[in-house]
UniProtKB/Swiss-Prot annotation:
Primary location class: cytoplasm
Subunit description: Subunit of dynactin, a multiprotein complex part of a tripartite complex with dynein and a adapter, such as BICDL1, BICD2 or HOOK3. The dynactin complex is built around ACTR1A/ACTB filament and consists of an actin-related filament composed of a shoulder domain, a pointed end and a barbed end. Its length is defined by its flexible shoulder domain. The soulder is composed of 2 DCTN1 subunits, 4 DCTN2 and 2 DCTN3. The 4 DCNT2 (via N-terminus) bind the ACTR1A filament and act as molecular rulers to determine the length. The pointed end is important for binding dynein-dynactin cargo adapters.
Keyword Cell division recorded: yes
Gene name per UniProt: DCTN3
UniProt modified residues of type N-acetylalanine: 2
GO cellular component terms, semicolon-separated: centrosome; cleavage furrow; cytosol; dynactin complex; kinetochore; midbody; nucleolus; perinuclear region of cytoplasm
Species this chain originates from: Homo sapiens
One annotated GO biological process: microtubule-based process
Keywords: Acetylation, Cell cycle, Cell division, Centromere, Chromosome, Coiled coil, Cytoplasm, Cytoskeleton, Kinetochore, Mitosis
Protein name: Dynactin subunit 3
PANTHER family: DYNACTIN SUBUNIT 3
Length: 186
């Protein structure tokens, strides 16, 4: 009975294919898609019987279909001993994950606290404070640059004063030396 319904489904699919190829009321004449499919099947059979590589490929296609079957994994199920070895090999990792999950579980009440729930209410205030902070950072940069310029001016002035004092000291030494020489002439 099931074979009959499969045959009917196949025949319906071939008729639908003929409608696609020839159109809904197409002039197909005596030509049928099934005849063309049979010819293709015979040609492929002839080719495969002549070529050894094609025979090997046909055998591999059957294996590939078998391996792609989702139930294949269930048929070659892993023994319980192997599953146990997998679990034991990952024991330390599993225990560390359990400890982390317990920590998260312990911290859940803190996430539900009133302080965390009030965060959206404080968002506008936080944004205003962030803007003030940015303005203060800009002011700080300006003050730093002004201070740097003032320090450079101070250093230049100090350097010039030092040079001037050195020149005055040299001039004073020369004048003192000249005054000491004159009293010896008397």
């Amino acid at each position: 009975m099931a074979g009959l319904t499969d045959l009917q489904r196949l025949q319906a699919r071939v008729e639908e294919l003929e409608r696609w190829v020839y159109g809904p009321g197409g002039a197909r004449g005596s030509r049928k898609v099934a005849d063309g499919l049979v010819k293709v099947q015979v040609a492929l059979g002839n080719i495969s019987s002549k070529r050894e590589r094609v025979k090997i490929l046909y055998k591999k296609i059957e294996d590939l279909i078998k391996y792609l079957d989702p139930e294949y994994i269930d048929r070659i199920a892993i023994p319980d001993a192997s599953k146990l070895q997998f679990i034991l090999a990952e024991e330390q990792f599993i225990l560390s994950q359990v400890a982390l999950l317990e920590q998260v579980n312990a911290l859940v009440p803190m996430l539900d606290s009133a302080h965390i729930k009030a965060v959206p209410e404080h968002a506008a205030r936080l944004q205003r404070l962030a803007q003030i902070h940015i303005q203060q950072q800009d002011q700080c940069v300006e003050i730093t640059e002004e201070s740097k310029a003032l320090l450079e001016e101070y250093n230049k002035t100090t350097m010039l004063l030092s040079k001037q004092f050195v020149q005055w000291d040299e001039l004073l030494c020369q004048l003192e030396a000249a005054t000491q020489v004159k009293p010896a002439e008397e």
